[in-house]
Amino acid sequence: MAGSATHLFLYDGAVFKAEADVMIPKRGSILLARHMAVRPADVVLDLGTGVGFLGILAARTARRVVATDVVPASVECARANAILNGVAHKMDFRLGDLYAPVSGMTFDLILANPPQMPTPPGRDDLKDPRLLADDGGPTGWATLDRILRDAPEHLRPGGRLLFTCFAFLGVRRALAKVEAAGLQGWIVGRELHPFPRIGLERFDLIRSLDDEGTIREEHGRLFVERLVVGAAAP
């Protein structure tokens, strides 16, 4: 009997289930998971939680985690995965766009692996949720800029924002944007990844944005660095 496929994803002793309409964690989320230093007293915000990957991993250490997502199916999936992994009592799942569901709240740590694939202007095929999940606007910064703009009002003194960023969006640009938001920035981690398949059909646009020449070609294959950028409140 036909039905929607269920995907299982295992990471560091945690189990994540997702139906076909919710994406499993990809390289950026895994990179961020390896570099998020969560403290026992932390109250954490997971922006765009998806299957709940980052929030659930953080909840194993943190005092409390709030996870938001604009997609109802993702919120329900993440809530189910929190129960599956025994951390539901430490988590609060909220439906809404980025910070909208946490108005007036502040956090010790904010985690984000947002859409950041540059999308050519005039694209009219973004009804596919899989494409929307990667849509960073014409420069790749559409969602990242919103996260940085509003981060200061949601960070406690000394609080940290950790977000992923393709190097072709600009390493210096990323740090300058963090500073412009009134935060102190640094590169937490970096890793070389095969060039994303979704980026190949928009390669000319991406190459035009790569002011720092970060895209590499080795043995006929393209590679790009993925960064974890830190931003700390005063």
Label every model-predicted segment.
Residues 64-69:
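Conserved SAM-binding motif I beta-strand of class I
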Residues 141-199:
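Conserved Class I SAM-dependent methyltransferase catalytic core
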Residues 114-143:
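Mobile active-site "lid"/loop adjacent to the S-adenosyl-L-methionine
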Residues 71-73:
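Conserved SAM/SAH-binding beta-strand->alpha-helix loop
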Residues 87-98:
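Conserved SAM-binding strand-loop segment of SAM-dependent methyltransferases
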Residues 99-110:
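A short acidic, Gly/Pro-enriched loop at the edge of an enzyme's catalytic core
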Residues 171, 183-229:
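Class I S-adenosyl-L-methionine
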Residues 1-61, 77, 209-232:
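SAM-dependent Rossmann-like transferase core, predominantly class I methyltransferases
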